[in-house]
Each structure stands twice: as C-alpha cells, then as structure tokens.
UniProtKB/Swiss-Prot annotation:
Domain of life: Bacteria
Positions of the RPE1 insert domain: 5-51
UniProt-recorded name of the protein: Probable cytochrome c oxidase subunit 2
Localisation: Cell membrane
Keywords: Cell membrane, Copper, Electron transport, Heme, Iron, Membrane, Metal-binding, Respiratory chain, Translocase, Transmembrane, Transmembrane helix, Transport
Organism: Rickettsia prowazekii (strain Madrid E)
A molecular-function term among this protein's GO annotations: copper ion binding
Gene symbol of the encoding locus: ctaC
Amino acid sequence: MNIIRYWSKQSYKKLKVDQEHNTTEYTNVCNSTSLGSTYTLPLKMELWKIYITLIYFLITNSNCFASEPLAWQITFQPPASPIMEELYHFHNFLLYIGTAIVLFVAGLLGFVCIRFNAKNNPVPAKFAHNLLIEIIWTVIPIIILVIIAVPSFRILRHAEKIPEIDLTIKVVGYQWYWHYIYPDYDNLEFDSVMISDKNLQIGQKRLLDVDNRIVIPENTTVRFLITAGDVIHSFAVPSLGFKIDAVPGRINETWTRVTKKGVYYGQCSELCGINHGFMPIAIEVVSKEDFNNWIALKNKTAMNNKSSKLMSK
C-alpha cells in the first residue's frame, strides 16, 4: 500500500507519550548521516497530523501511475485516453458541486434543528408558503442542472462521434472468455483466457492477466466492434473510459486513442454466469514498430498452426 511505502521512506519516529503532562515526544532516528532531534508537542496536535496524513493518502492512493485496481482505491484510475481525461475532470467538477450541496443542506438542517426547536421557539410560526423561497429553490437547482448538463452532453457527443479509424478490432464475448479478431491484418484471431492461479508467473496479476492480450499501437485511433456469442457480456476498461455491452445478435461499437504505453486492465461488467468474475480484459499499448513486429509474429504462429493441422490430417 502507498501509505506503508510512504512511512517506510520517512525517518523512523519513536513515539513516547508522557501521560502526566499529556505531551508527545518524538525522537527522529535517521541514518548515519542524519542528526537526531527531539521535540515535544501537544498530543492532540500530533494525532490530528496523523489523521490528516492517513486521510490524504487514502484519497490520493489511486492517483499513482497504475492502470489496474488498487487496494483502498476510491477514485478513478489515471486516465489514458481523451474520453477518460474528460470524464475524469468532469467527475472532479461534479464532486465539488455535490460536496457544496451536501454541506449547504447539512448546515441548513443543523441550523433549523437548533434555531427552531421547541426550547428556542416554543410558539411555532404558522404560514402556508413563501413565494421568494419557492422561487429560489426552483431557479437555483435549474441553474445547477444546466451547468452540469452542458459539459455532460459535450462529452457524450465526443464519445459517440467516431473519428477516422486507424485500426479495427472485433470483440466477441463468450462464457467465460473473450475472442478477438483483427480484420485489417488477414483476420488474425485468438482467444483470451484468464491465467489460473496455478499458472500465474511472477509479475502477473491475479484475476487480471490473460494468456493473450489485445495489442494496439499508441496514439492510434482504434475502433472496437463488440458482440457476444451466447449471453450478454460487457466490455469495460476503466482507465480508457469505455463500457460497452456485448449483446448476442447485435454489434455495438466504441473507440479509443491511448496516449500512454502500458497494460490496461478491465473486466466483464455484466453478470453472465458462474464464472463472470473470471473474464478479465488486458490491453497492451506499444510503439507502432513493436505492434508491427507482434502482428508478424502472430501471423507466423497462426500459419504454423494451420500447417500442423494439415499435416496431422
């Protein structure tokens, strides 16, 4: 966890509480080149520092450079596509608005409970309505909704409008694996199955890594054509900002343009049976040169497999 990493990088601090004077004594035990120092501060102040530090790292834990779920993560994964960049900033914008509304309503509720309780206000006021208040609580929410709607529709339009495509990948969901086809490269196709615990290698991620990843070049506009061969699935990769249902007999599409090299993980996000939780998605983003080399290797492997099958017959 990032909190543990953070504390391990700091000078080790020995905490000694003086119960008699309610103070805290810190002794910094640093490396051989550092100087030790001792100082005392009120215990409550030090506890607040610890609480604030813990809250900070819990909130910002998921903002490290990772393309996968993390322990204690409570925000989005770092965005790696233009759509996800917009969604990420829009989410933060909504968070400010929502927080302000919650604080205002909670404060107003607290004020009313204290100011107009039976003790402070033994004779309650009796009135049917107040025109000014009714106008305020109608107009202000409308303004807030308009402020939210404008960027929301802009992002929806951006996501729905598919630009000029450089690469197309067909995605077919099955119980419980994915099948990928590259129609631009002689219909190169392969299955992608989660690596089981017994076959997991060092460095591979449990429940996320697969035997065959989708490989795409960076800074390339990729279109995904998504369907299913049995039941409804959902093709979702959070860090790329898309979640598209895979429906039998229907083709849905989405697009992405990944700006950072790396491996981005997703999962089937529609309950599809007993092994629904074991349908991970892994998209590896590489340079265009590495992508061409990967395509050549895959095609060569496919040709060898076909030759082997023909020879066996």
